[in-house]
């Protein structure tokens, strides 16, 4: 019986009081108890593989977890079938996909539809009564998902956990009682194994390497297990999850899976006669030694292998002495225990070394990918510095060689090394062949650099000049981005990356506050010499939106605007002469305070994630009313901001209706309170679908109105033309508003409040503070990227897979649809980065589209945004992939480096999609 996400403390800790029958068995000495540690990644499919094969799955199984295929590797389930055992299975359908045609009877349940935690377990339990009276099966496997789904929805502290554990305890009692009755009439006793596949983080998710995610209980029950010592919860034997496969194989008289790395638990073999126990350990050690010989070249001189040889010799000597027991005075059990200890040391030593070195990597593919990323980085740098890149002329010969090396050779090499006619010369693994193969790829990046720097010999000089002319704030944005990238070379900085972004964001906020405070003070004490906030020195390189302007043109525009109280590019849009400079000081100070509150909203990272935070306090059952009021106020705040930015009455009403729908969706889930409604919580699918319907209606309305305005536009109709420009300039802001409420629908209830604060900060930044700072478009892009990354961590995300909110993928769904689920999860996870990027485009569009030459300037600004975004992704990817490839055998490769690489890859995919849409 496997209970998904069953943490060790749910059985052995304080929560064990909710499983009274199980605890009574533990304390009466009627069970064998272990703590089984799982290797990361702690997601279901890799854990099932580990339980069945005794091996350590790779991190690619995190992706394959959503689409499991047949397991080809030797495993315990296949050995059961080959031995003629009849197996029945009920529960997570991942087992059915991994082991097709293995089960005599099955009833699979979908493991990914996390909003259901009742029906999914009932569909398993309904078969138990009938199966316990059947005698046509030998092995029954039950996989319960309800506890895992509750964790994803509400966390381990939810009031739903207690009744679920009581429900599981009642099932354990039913099965154990029935098996004890059957054993009274059977020759061989039954074995009941209770375990978990992984644990559950304090946020309710899993996938990472924290103790709460990796530590699970293993309890063995049988009519033959009696009179054990009273359990000491502080001294429970610890094993690895991969040890379960060889342990069960030996207890059931089956061959151990060929590639198992597990070592049978001595505690599980404790009840066997000493001769049988030593024989079982010999079989396990022999199997491990076979794997060891295949994977450790110097095994003959290795201490672990020599220990195995000594254990074999001691075992042989023990058997000889046992045969001469009548002639020689010996204590068979005492000597046998010494032999068992030698076997155990040999097994644990070989297991540890194999586990740390067994991973195999395609070095050629790794190097190829790294070099291609560096090519992209160099190319983007070149394009960013040389803004006339669109008219750059490259010789035909250079272009042909570049294409051949970039596409032709890698394709040919891939086909050669993966096809049936594999070439040992190109694809071998010895030093000479690897050198010949990888040397070609090194030539590839050298050629790329040669083409780039020979086509523009002044590139470095131009880039240096462009840096020297930037403002201190722009330099800080550039140096901070580069500094953050190199900070990723430290595992501690990766684990606590949120601290870097919090520091950067608050530094920007303080710079803005100091800037406006200085201007306000200057205006107060020198009213006659007040400097306009948008003006800069004449030698400034370029202002926000001034990309590519010559000094003469910039001076001309300043002269034209010298008599105006508005910025030269916003004159006519609003009345600026009456603006109080202290207004910007107040807004800047509010941003600083709000971001400090957000810093404490969700503790994340590794070292301090366990500390209590505002979110933990709000999700407590006794704080439901407080959360309800805060969610309502937050939704009202978002609606007010949207009403300020939109004049269209239909939009205003639709967005207000969507906000109400979001609240009722959370009320249906039981997260917030609505008086007289939703006495029994449900998944809120209908409420969420109503919100989706409103969004669809808004999109259709916008599209039809856009078509109508464009069709009725006449060249001589200046009024229509002006309206069309205004309408076009507001399109990104409309998308931004829809995206805002989609995010509010998907995030956890307490994060609705956090995201409302992010919306408030974005409104102040975009509409009031930054437009008056004359930042270049590239600097604006970096600033918005910084705020987006900080918001990513404000949501409670981290570089651990455990913080991914799986439940967001099922909002409004009645059935399992992997495409929609993946899209919703991506939106919820990367809500803040996407939100800020769309906000950036909204600001640029509103600024340029209404101007006389606005279309050309908007296109130029869009190119700047795309190049800067590309660089902001290519730089960390190029650096970090080198680190990940070099440290692929590091202790933290699975717990730190690999999850971060997955996050970087997914963030890059979303950024590329955004660039393509632009």
Segment roles from a protein language model:
Residues 7-137, 145-152, 239-273:
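Active-site-proximal alpha/beta segments of enzymes that process anionic O-linked groups
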Residues 16-21, 158-161, 209-213:
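Glycine-rich, phosphate-binding/catalytic loops in enzymes
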Residues 60-61, 109-112, 153-158, 201-203, ...:
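Flexible glycine/proline-enriched surface loops and loop-helix/loop-strand junctions
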Residues 118-140, 147-204, 543:
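A long, amphipathic alpha-helix that forms part
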Residues 194-233, 278:
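Histidine-centered active-site microenvironments of extracellular/periplasmic hydrolases
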Residues 265, 269-375, 397, 401-410, ...:
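Phosphate/adenylate-binding glycine loop and adjacent helical scaffold
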Residues 356-918:
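Alpha-helical transmembrane segments of integral membrane proteins
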């Amino acid at each position: 019986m496997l209970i998904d996400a069953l943490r060790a403390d749910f059985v052995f800790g304080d929560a064990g009081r909710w499983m009274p029958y199980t605890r009574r068995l533990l304390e009466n000495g009627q069970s064998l108890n272990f703590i089984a540690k799982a290797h990361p990644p702690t997601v279901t499919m890799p854990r099932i593989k580990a339980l069945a094969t005794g091996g350590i799955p790779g991190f690619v199984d995190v992706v394959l977890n959503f689409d499991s295929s047949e397991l080809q590797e030797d495993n315990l389930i296949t050995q059961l079938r080959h031995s003629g055992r009849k197996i029945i299975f009920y529960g997570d359908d991942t087992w059915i996909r991994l082991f097709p045609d293995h089960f005599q009877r099955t009833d699979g349940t979908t493991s990914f539809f996390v909003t259901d935690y009742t029906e999914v377990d009932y569909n398993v339990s309904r078969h138990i009564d009938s199966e316990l009276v059947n005698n046509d099966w030998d092995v029954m496997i039950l996989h319960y998902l309800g506890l895992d789904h509750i964790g994803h929805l509400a966390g381990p502290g939810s009031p739903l956990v207690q009744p679920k554990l009581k429900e599981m305890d009642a099932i354990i009692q039913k099965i154990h009682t029935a098996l004890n009755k059957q054993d009274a009439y059977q020759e061989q006793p039954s074995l009941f194994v209770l375990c978990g596949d992984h644990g559950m983080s304090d946020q309710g998710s899993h996938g990472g390497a924290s103790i709460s995610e990796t530590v699970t209980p293993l309890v063995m029950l049988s009519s033959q297990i009696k009179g054990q010592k009273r359990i000491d919860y502080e001294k429970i034997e610890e094993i690895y999850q991969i040890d379960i496969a060889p342990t069960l194989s030996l207890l059931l008289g089956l061959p151990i899976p060929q590639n198992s790395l597990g070592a049978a638990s001595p505690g599980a073999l404790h009840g066997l006669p000493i001769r049988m126990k030593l024989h079982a350990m010999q079989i396990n050690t022999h199997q491990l030694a076979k794997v060891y010989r295949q994977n450790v070249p110097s095994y003959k001189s290795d201490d672990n292998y020599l220990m195995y040889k000594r254990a074999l010799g001691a075992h042989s000597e023990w058997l000889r002495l046992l045969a001469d027991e009548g002639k020689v005075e010996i204590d068979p059990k005492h000597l046998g225990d010494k032999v068992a200890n030698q076997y155990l040391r040999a097994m644990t030593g070989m297991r540890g070394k194999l586990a740390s070195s067994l991973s195999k990597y395609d070095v050629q593919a790794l190097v190829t990918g790294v070099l291609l990323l560096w090519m992209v980085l160099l190319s983007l740098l070149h394009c960013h510095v040389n803004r006339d890149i669109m008219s750059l002329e490259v010789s035909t010969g250079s272009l042909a060689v570049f294409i051949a090396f970039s596409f032709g050779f890698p394709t040919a090499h891939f086909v050669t090394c993966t096809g049936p006619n594999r070439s040992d010369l190109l694809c071998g693994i010895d030093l000479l062949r690897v050198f010949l193969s990888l040397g070609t790829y090194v030539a590839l990046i050298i050629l790329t650099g040669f083409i780039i720097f020979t086509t523009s010999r002044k590139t470095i000089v131009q880039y240096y000049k462009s840096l020297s002319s930037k403002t201190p704030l722009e330099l800080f944005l550039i140096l901070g981005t580069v500094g953050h990238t190199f900070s990723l070379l430290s595992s501690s900085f990766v684990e606590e990356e949120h601290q870097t972004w919090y520091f950067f964001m608050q530094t920007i906020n303080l710079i803005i506050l100091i800037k406006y405070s200085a201007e306000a003070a200057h205006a107060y004490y020198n009213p006659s010499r007040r400097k306009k906030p948008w003006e800069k020195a004449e030698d400034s390189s370029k202002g926000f939106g001034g990309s590519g302007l010559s000094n003469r043109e910039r001076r001309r525009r300043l002269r034209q605007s010298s008599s105006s109280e508005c910025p030269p590019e916003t004159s006519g849009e609003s009345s600026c002469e009456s603006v109080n400079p202290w207004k910007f000081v107040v807004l800047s100070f509010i941003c600083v305070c709000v971001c400090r509150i957000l810093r404490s909203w969700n503790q994340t990272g590794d070292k301090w994630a366990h500390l209590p935070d505002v979110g933990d306090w709000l999700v407590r059952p006794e704080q439901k009313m407080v959360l309800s009021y805060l969610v309502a106020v937050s939704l009202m705040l978002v609606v007010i901001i949207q009403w300020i930015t939109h004049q269209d009455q239909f939009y205003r009403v639709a967005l207000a209706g969507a906000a109400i729908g979001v609240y009722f969706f959370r009320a249906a889930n039981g997260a917030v309170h609505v008086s007289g409604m939703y006495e029994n919580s449900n998944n809120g699918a209908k409420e969420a679908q109503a919100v989706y319907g409103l969004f669809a209606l808004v999109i259709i309305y916008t599209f039809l109105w856009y078509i109508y305005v464009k069709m009725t536009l006449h060249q001589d109709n200046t009024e229509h033309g002006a309206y069309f420009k205004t309408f076009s300039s507001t399109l990104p802001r409309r998308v931004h508003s829809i995206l805002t409420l989609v995010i509010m629908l998907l995030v956890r209830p307490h994060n609705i409040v956090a995201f409302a604060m992010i919306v408030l900060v974005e409104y102040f930044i975009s509409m009031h503070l930054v437009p008056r700072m004359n930042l270049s478009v590239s600097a604006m892009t970096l600033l918005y990227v910084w705020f987006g990354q900080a918001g990513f961590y404000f949501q409670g995300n981290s570089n651990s897979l455990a913080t991914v909110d799986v439940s967001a993928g099922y909002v409004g769904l009645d059935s399992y649809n992997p495409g929609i689920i993946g899209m919703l999860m991506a939106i919820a996870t990367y809500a803040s980065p996407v939100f800020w990027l769309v906000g950036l485009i909204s600001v640029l569009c509103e600024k340029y589209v209404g101007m006389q030459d606005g279309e050309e300037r908007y296109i130029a600004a869009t190119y700047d945004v795309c190049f800067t975004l590309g660089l902001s992704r290519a730089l960390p990817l190029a650096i970090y992939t080198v680190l990940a490839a070099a440290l692929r055998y590091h202790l933290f490769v699975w717990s730190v480096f690999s999850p971060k690489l997955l996050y970087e890859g997914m963030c890059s995919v979303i950024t590329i999609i955004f660039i393509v849409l632009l």
